[in-house]
């Protein structure tokens, strides 16, 4: 067994803490009603939702924010596939849509076994084109439910939509491990993060609780290149791949969602009430 001297251990801990504390926050855009669903496109821009205003917006470095869609029906989570197509959870229409580069919109999911979905919220797309999304319900959405459970679903590249898991609490944020072999889901009611193993066909197994208790209500998750989970739940809790909390970033206003982006995928984009922010290490 190798034992570290106290001085070496203290230095290691100090450098480790600096990795998460040496962040510079920039306010990119503001004046929205409630922002959600940041998603970075490989073509060099960020998409985010202004949910109450039914708008999808596009932020490109050095350019004014553009309205991509003004009829997005209560958009929440967004994601891009390898082809640059945009996937959006629409809470008002209770469906998942895909927008191609020409602007054509198609519906991917709106019912399960003949019943309307609750209100799709978080979404992520694998490299092979598999789509996973969460289906909770909040506020007025709860009064119009046809399903008697909250769910996580999988839409394979070919074939019918599948139910990954039923939740008693409301699943919210969703993302992958860096290698795409683990699916992470935040449970807003249980205040935990669950993990599922994914096989080469995208089938999920080994459902388990990875983070037993998050800080606040977990509404968004992003994973960095080291596999650490950045969980938005008011503040930002950072957890290692084993679920151990490494650090907490305290925020003045609650963070609803987060996503990594830009060319090096090391900028953390945050939706904070009516504001969109970016965090990077001070030296970057």
Enumerate the predicted regions with their spans.
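Predominantly a core beta-strand signature of beta-propeller blades
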Residues: 24-25, 63-66, 104-106, 159-163, ...
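Beta-rich, blade/repeat-based domains predominating
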Residues: 24, 30-45, 71-90, 95, ...
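Bacterial N-terminal signal peptides
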Residues: 3-14
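Blade/loop signatures of beta-propeller domains
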Residues: 15-24, 43, 53
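Beta-propeller domains
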Residues: 45-69
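Short loop/turn segments immediately following beta-strands, especially the blade-tip
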Residues: 196-203, 281-284
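A short loop-to-beta-strand structural motif that recurs across blades of beta-propeller domains
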Residues: 55-57, 95-97, 150-153, 192-194, ...
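A detector of repeated loop/turn-to-beta-strand junctions in beta-rich toroidal repeat architectures
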Residues: 53, 93, 146-150, 190, ...
